[in-house]
Amino acid sequence: MSILKSSIQPNGLKEVSLGNSIGAFEKLLRDEYQRGNVVFELDTHFLIVVFMDSIIVKVNLLYNKVAQISFYNKFLGKFNDIGIGSTLGVFMDTYPTAEYDDDQNFFYIPNSTYENMAFFFENPYSFASDNKLEEITINDSSLLVICSNT
């Protein structure tokens, strides 16, 4: 199965998990690199690995741990039946306790095993558009954590 169709787990995707070292997904990285599906970028303290212009993995080089996994574009995987293209209405039906972070423009699910996930929608959310929940779709979703040395 293509990594683009993998289901999202609370801590990652396939061999790529938050807090793991790059060695944990070395085989996947090597296989996808040989197929021409991987691009590497360097940022301050981070190695950024881009799979098929649809999955971005940020590895904290100070700790050699995966700090963030983001899903975009052609990613077809789902997280509890929520994925790119899902509407805000379906998301809110599935997660009625979800909260919106006005400053960062994403939804998250507090006090749950999924609170490290952020769901970004195509337009900034506003209560004025609350009656148009079926018209607002997810355009990317990300697993976010802050790396520690533990």
Language-model region placement:
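Short helix/turn-capping signatures at newly exposed starts of structured segments
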Residues: 1-115, 120-150
